[in-house]
Swiss-Prot record:
Residues 450-463 have a biased composition (Basic and acidic residues). Residues 453-502 form the bHLH domain. Coiled coil: none annotated. Residues 453-466 are annotated as: Basic motif. Disruption phenotype: Altered morphology of type VI glandular trichomes. Strong reduction of volatile terpene synthesis in trichomes. Strong reduction of the expression of terpene synthase genes in trichomes. GO terms for cellular component: nucleus. PANTHER family: MYC, TRANSCRIPTION FACTOR MYC1. Residues 440-449 have a biased composition (Basic residues). The keyword Acetylation does not apply. Its main location: nucleus. Highly expressed in trichomes and at lower levels in leaves and flowers. Expressed at low levels in roots, stems, leaves, flowers and fruits. It is found in: Nucleus. This is Transcription factor MYC1.
Amino acid sequence: MTDYRLWSNTNTTNTCDDTMMMDSFLSSDPSSFWPASTPNRPTPVNGVGETMPFFNQESLQQRLQALIDGARESWAYAIFWQSSVVDFASQTVLGWGDGYYKGEEDKNKRRGSSSSAANFVAEQEHRKKVLRELNSLISGVQASAGNGTDDAVDEEVTDTEWFFLISMTQSFVNGNGLPGLAMYSSSPIWVTGTEKLAASQCERARQAQGFGLQTIVCIPSANGVVELGSTELIFQSSDLMNKVKYLFNFNIDMGSVTGSGSGSGSCAVHPEPDPSALWLTDPSSSVVEPKDSLIHSSSRDVQLVYGNENSENQQQHCQGFFTKELNFSGYGFDGSSNRNKTGISCKPESREILNFGDSSKRFSGQSQLGPGPGLMEENKNKNKNKKRSLGSRGNNEEGMLSFVSGVILPTSTMGKSGDSDHSDLEASVVKEAVVEPEKKPRKRGRKPANGREEPLNHVEAERQRREKLNQRFYALRAVVPNVSKMDKASLLGDAIAYINELKSKVQNSDLDKEELRSQIECLRKELTNKGSSNYSASPPLNQDVKIVDMDIDVKVIGWDAMIRIQCSKKNHPAARLMAALKDLDLDVHHASVSVVNDLMIQQATVKMGSRLYAQEQLRIALTSKIAESR
């Protein structure tokens, strides 16, 4: 296993152009992301701490490496998304905390899928160019053909390596993206298969599928979310989740964490004191042996000593979380940067450790950074004026490229010989005004209704509004019978057309209803007149000849109708029915007549010709026609 490191023989001071480029590459003022500092704790000059911090860069790097190397599955990378709060009113933001890249086991999978060889070569040149410029930006060596930088980045950059690099530029609001959803729901998210990744609503999952990944896992922990990715199909494993919960409990001493290549790992727990009482430490060595995947870590505590006018020794320990935005597009470089003697590679190899974080105006051989910036108090008697220190170490033997978002581990300026083989320590103190947290004004107004939760901020309110709007669209789509397209505009257009169609049907039904009422009134008048005339013209005995007990039942199905008439057999009711059907322009498909004693039952199946009758209309028309024939 090879560490992702930058070797340097001389200390290099960047010029103004490098400083401007660095400010554009990294966030220049992360102080707004830091939480309030903890109280000072004075330390003796020659004292040495006994324990490591429960959450620092070395510990986090070891945990990620132990998680991958000790797993039975073949994971390509591991990323720890660190949770932080931008301000007092916003939600939690997940940003890059640290990452460990191992690579694929199968070397045949390293080559990304490209449409043509020319596109593949152009893509590789672009990736190598970005890595060379990133290397020259950090090391102070301008990328050119004469300094050996091109030879240093000669191996192809795989898709998984590139996906791992661009992940440093991403951040997730609580509830958005796979890491944000895992943090919001406090439950792991396991996506396996290219189809599920491509169909996911998360842009990061679709991007991972495009870069050849087949499995992505996001497991929440106390301080953030652990993400693992693989180019193989790996199904859900409770053993992995238990390891994450155990390894990323930051009260565990990582000096006793060991992992084996066979997939078994064991961790020993040592009690740690209160984090507020821990000293700032400077881990001096971290050796990783790839043969048995054993992780050994040793650290020595270096205390910060600052002299003021009263010769008082003070130390400030605080932790903060902040996010970085890295831009991997092309950068322009001029010849103002100091050059190193050798070309340095910034490309992560297989099973490499890659860290990105804050940097200062000056760079020595090795920048030792931990998980957050350290703030030092200058004097207790000076109205709480504070100083910020960024410690950097120079080592002639090795330099480690470290971009870490987290607490900076500052080093002291205690006396050491310039000819010593160990790195010299420098401490720069910058005065900084105290930023008092603004008191959030209390909201005035009515309380929300019972059972309705008040949104935390405008982002949550907008999210709830969009969810409610989407639910209404789903309900509308369910009631509209014919939907041309699935977009919202087409759905609204189809709904409007359907509503207009229903309105026209209602209007036609009202017109038919009025027409039927008028016909019924006319029939009543005619029947009344005929009844009175027949009563006066014929004797009472002939009144019994009329079809008084005639029962007509009509059922209409489309253009077909079924007619059933039950009446007396006197005065030829079958002939009167056929005459009525002829007058109404109804074609007879089937007809039957049966007689039981004095009762005649007629059944007929007809088809409407020129006019479509409703059920009640046809019954009234048949009644009137048979009565007229009578």
